[in-house]
Amino acid sequence: MSALSSVLTFGRMIKFSHSIFALPFAFSGAALAAAQAGISVAQVAWITLAMVGARSAAMGFNRLADRHLDAANPRTSGRELPQGVVSPTAVGLFVVISSAALAFSAWQLNPLCLYLSPLVLAVLFFYSLCKRFTWASHLVLGLSLGGAPLGAWIAVTGSIAWPPILLGLAVLLWVAGFDIFYACQDYEHDISAGLHSIPARFGIERALVIARVLHLLAVVVMVLVGRSAGLNVVY
């Protein structure tokens, strides 16, 4: 496999193109912080690399941890690891390199970011194991992405405050809600495989209600973000 082919294969495996949808979570926290403390081009660059590294490490670990589950699921059996396109060893190395990119970026930003980077990785990796024992895995995924605004705020200010905490909570609720919708696709497989999810635990109809409630709460919390940050009606 050529170098370019390898890069493209790993990019498909972790859905690298979807990083563009994850970056706004971090940039929204950075924007809140910049309004109070200013921000440099270097900080934006390191925040971007940290976010890409964190997401790549999380996706790589998820594919590695779930490779046997993916092979048994018709929806995911065509992924690169179940198909043998990439090896578990190569994916493990990819996770290590991506984790190092996150840690190095955190080191370049400030000490608090560096100290918190192992905790971030622990939460990201923990999510991949959750479906084996709890239906609350959707909330853990929300926590994984909800940490991005707070992390970006810390990257800019070196401190913790309520606006990014509330913004992170809004992201948590929104992500958990759409992940419940997504999990409805695997309802029958999850039950047969003994995997845990809100649709598998409560049924699809109740799961959809729960997802809608979470999204409604996300909107409420977003309003609180604006109030806590002193933003005007345009926000």
Regions found by a protein language model. Name each.
Residues 15-32, 144-146:
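The first (N-terminal) embedded transmembrane alpha-helix
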Residues 14, 66, 137, 186:
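Residue-level signature of catalytic and energy-coupling elements of molecular machines
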Residues 2-10, 15, 179-180, 189-190:
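Membrane-proximal soluble regions of multi-pass membrane proteins
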Residues 31-49, 112-124, 138-193, 204-218, ...:
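Functional transmembrane core segments of multi-pass inner-membrane proteins
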Residues 3, 7-12, 49, 56, ...:
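Intramembrane alpha-helical segments
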Residues 54-69:
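Juxtamembrane transmembrane-helix boundary signature
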Residues 20, 45-51, 67-117, 192-234:
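Multi-pass membrane catalytic core of lipid/isoprenoid biosynthesis enzymes
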